[in-house]
Every structure is written in C-alpha cells, then in structure tokens.
Amino acid sequence: MIAAAAAALVIGAGTLGGVVGTQLAGSRTSTAGSSTSTAIAVALAAGQTLSTAQVASVVSPSVVTITATGNRQTSEGSGIVLSSNGRILTNNHVVAGSTSRGGRGGPIAIEVTLANGKKANATVVSQDATHDLAVLQASGVSGLTAATIGTGAAVNVGDSVLAFGSPLGLEGTVTAGIVSAVNRSIDSGGSTLTNLIQTDAAINAGNSGGPLVNAAGQVIGINVANATASNGSGSIGVGFAIPVSTAIGMINGNVG
C-alpha cells in the first residue's frame, strides 16, 4: 500500500483538460528496414533478448490510443491489440465513463487511434471492474499487428522492461526501466488491485491500458497507475502494471 501522506495514487488515464487534453496530431509509427527485421526475427527464434530499439520496433504497431467520451467526461488512455480484426485490451477505468455498464456518463463514443494514425470507432465487448480490465472491438479494421502475450513468461525483480502508451496525449511514447518489485497491492478509487508489477519505467496520465513488455518483446503487464508526490507532479519512478496472468482469462475469452 502507498501511504497517503507520502504519495497520492493517480490512475494513469487522465481526464482531458489543460495539458492532458492537448493531444499531438499525426502518426508516430516506427518502421524497421529489412535487415533490422531479419535480425529481430532471428533473435526471437533463438529465444534471445532484443535491444531496446528492437523491442520498440516490434511492439509499437500493437499499441493504440483510446479516447472515450461520456456525458460528463472525456478520458484518454492506451490499449493493446489482441487480434488482427481489432480486439483491444485496456483498463476498465479508461472506458468506464463512456459505457452503460459501470459508467456514469452513459454511452457516447469510444475512438481508437491506431499506430499508423488511422482512427476507428470502438465498442466495449467485455469488462472486469474488479481487476480494472476491458476488451474493445474496433470497427472496420483488419490486418492489425497483434501483440505477443507473455503467457508464462517469468517476471523477476531487476528484469528490463519498456512501458508503451500515450502519456499526456503524446502518442507512441516508450519509456524504459526495470521490474522494481512484484506482488504489490494498491488502493485505487475505492477498490484494491493486487499482485501488481511495480516498475520505475515512467507511467503517466494516458499510459493506462498500454503494455509493459519484457526484453523479448512480450507483454507481461498492463499499465494501470502511478504514484506522484504530494504536489501532484508527474512520474516519480513508481508505476504499476496488472500482470498478464490476471488478464489471461479475459484475453482467451475474447480472442478466438
């Protein structure tokens, strides 16, 4: 638990407004040349770890930005592509205000911005408020690059990790760090999230729902929250992600 006197827990998908509401336009897709792609394929086939740049190249096409608009609020977060036809994993709190199931604002609109800059409408197909997870379906999309889910991948303190997402509306952002701790519990919005991965990779408002990945480019967690100093400043190197083991049931149930 985080002591309230020391740090305030901030859910990673901020309400739009002020600087959080200033989303940069344009695509930030990272493409790799043929020689780089071949090197990555060889490394993955051999079970080797990748460089930070290689991991970013592999994972970035599978990360989306989510803008959810309800009657009372608009929130922004990130998501992980689960299938080529547009199934997307994110945090429930990113879309809860825009859905009738558990949302205050009533259903209005959810828009997904893909890694190539294209936009698509989306609907919620599954929610798990207890574990802060949701699965979306993007409309009219095909040929998307699904992320590699690290089912069974070991998560050890000290492992190198990268966090992906759209902090403060900055699409295509990648931050690096390590696994700082495992099995953390935090109090979030009146509920308790358990078995979380703690990382010092920067996680800020807008990162929620984005992937935390290991050095093999496998998704090992879903970014969910960060701790801030009492003055409300940005990342202080204490971020949290829901482990894939918690989400695997929802993933398997929605990707066939």
Regions found by a protein language model. Give the residues of each.
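Conserved hydrophobic/aromatic pocket- or pore-lining residues that grip, position, or stack substrates
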Residues: 64, 158, 179
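N-terminal activation segment of mature serine protease catalytic domains
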Residues: 15-78, 84, 249-253
